[in-house]
UniProtKB/Swiss-Prot annotation:
SUPFAM superfamilies (alphabetical): Winged helix' DNA-binding domain (SSF46785)
GO BP term, pick one: response to stress
Location of the HTH marR-type domain: 17-152
Functional summary from the UniProt entry: Necessary for photosynthetic and respiratory growth.
Feature: DNA-binding region: 66-89
UniProt keyword Glycosyltransferase present: no
Transmembrane spans: none
UniProtKB keywords: DNA-binding, Transcription, Transcription regulation
Keyword set includes DNA-binding: yes
Record's protein name: HTH-type transcriptional regulator PetP
Disulfide bonds: none
């Protein structure tokens, strides 16, 4: 058995159900912490997490098509349209007709949208930076490996495309 060097002599290869349960619970609580600061900001604008995810990925890939955003977010066209309608009406997102295909809609953040995106992202970067510094580089690399291994194959492809675009 490979020892992780973790307190309690936990091993990498043979985790018990109890150890896995603790990991699941840690993910739940970490997610609550990760989303708490942006949630407070979103509440001030009467937005929710769906708005945040849309803003994040539109910022990440300006000109992203609605179809691609639906795929990345794993939502229905109907649910995304409600979110996009709000963001467009509020002046945070612009929808532009495709140059090659007039049926396509390409999404871009406006300056107002970019300001909100920076505020939301900075709130999460502060929390992640502190956690990463506390954990150290090996833990950060291991954490990323675990997250990538947990992704569904389609989501992993989207994630890989974003990484490759850097």
């Amino acid at each position: 058995m490979a020892d992780t060097g973790a307190p309690g002599g936990e091993t990498l290869l043979f985790l018990t159900d109890e150890q896995l349960r603790k990991g699941i619970e840690a993910m739940f609580f970490a997610y609550r912490g990760f989303t708490a600061d942006p949630d407070r900001i979103l509440d001030q604008h009467d937005y929710g997490r769906a708005h945040h995810r849309a803003i994040h990925f539109i910022n990440r890939e300006p000109g992203l098509t609605v179809t691609t955003l639906i795929s990345v977010l794993g939502v229905t066209k109907q649910s995304l349209n409600r979110v996009l309608r709000t963001l467009i009406d509020d002046g945070l997102v612009e929808s532009r007709v495709g140059r090659r295909d007039k049926r396509e809609r390409h999404l871009h953040l406006t300056e107002k949208g970019a300001v909100l995106e920076r505020e939301l992202s900075e709130a999460q970067r502060v929390r992640m930076r502190a956690a990463y510094r506390a954990a150290g580089p090996q833990a950060v690399a291991g954490f990323r490996q675990v997250l990538e291994a947990m992704m569904d194959p389609a989501m992993r492809r989207h994630y890989q495309m974003l990484k490759d675009a850097e």
